Amino acid sequence: MGKRVVIVGPAYPLRGGLSTYNERLCKAYNDKGDKAFILSFSLQYPSILFPGKTQYSTEAAPEKIDIDTAINSINPLNWLRVGKKYRKLAPDIMVFRYWMPFMAPCLGTIAREIKKNGKTKIVAITDNIYPHEKHFYDHACTKYFVNSIDEFITMSHSVLADLKKLVPNKPSTYVAHPMYDNFGALIPKAEAIKSIGLDPEYRYLLFFGFIRQYKGLDLLLKAFAKSGLKDHKTKLIVAGEYYEDSAPYKELIKTLGLQDAVIERNDFIPNGKVANYFSAADMVVQTYHSATQSGVTQIAYHFNKPMLVTNVGGLAETVPHNEVGYVCEKDEQAIANALNDFYTHSREAEFSKNAEAFKKQFSWDKIMEAVGGKQQQQG
């Protein structure tokens, strides 16, 4: 008989990478015979705290996934009520997603209530221990959350190191971020380029995902200008919603003379269109100023796309340099040199073939095995 597993975190109708991950993990559990569903949010962020246009998807709900939209992130009475409900339900495992200290009081309180039943194993998949943008309450809130958890899984060694400083004696382990294989099949490049209204005479680099300072779009724009690729029928697609003021970026594009070389698609890219953008690109570029791990990397792997990443956080852990792409320091010239090397030496076919082989290690089974087993202490 399979286990009863509850995944705690965002899910449909909430949109974004966390929802995509949780829904795919839930599917993986059910596919192997467990009974899994998602405990999600009726209110995730108050609208005043959400930087994007909307938190909600306009697409159809994922098939064959049960979702309980019950958690109000800012209502302590709700946390106690939800915790008591799941304490009585007593699933075998509760898998909490943790990504920012704002959620710590809510999730930590629910976890504490559930633990009172003495039966349910409480595991956290920790995307971050500390956020990219710091706040005075980060340490206290995170400490409150981690003290409520039995075992931890991190998806980068840098997060594992942060976790060890907070709770050195709790079981924890590293498992690489699994590959997103739920965005459909690779589309022939010419067809994909046409489908998103671009000129098939050009080659395209892709910057994908919501835009905040730590994502390093400014660094990429400067490097792209330095590379001179705009004069060689190559353009940069920036596909993602601004989560901060777009004016400095637009001014930078103008200052660098890149108005005709940068294609901005600054709405949230729905799941049904992700394949079109990745299939149209020669390489996916992530010039982050800071990072832990990246879901974008695991979408790129699904589509066998070469990648350029900066040497921050856990990005370099999953992109072997000169095999599936480039690992660069946060330096405009180094990034420009790598971009030029990619095209000058026609690296796409080689890197793509290597990505197809390398991606086989990024399975959802590994996450499920880590959740189910007693974790080994890793340093």
Predicted region positions:
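Nucleotide-activated donor-binding/catalytic signature segment of Leloir-type glycosyltransferases, i.e.
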Residues: A247-G272
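Conserved acidic donor-binding segment of nucleotide-sugar-dependent glycosyltransferases
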Residues: H321-Q333, D341-S346
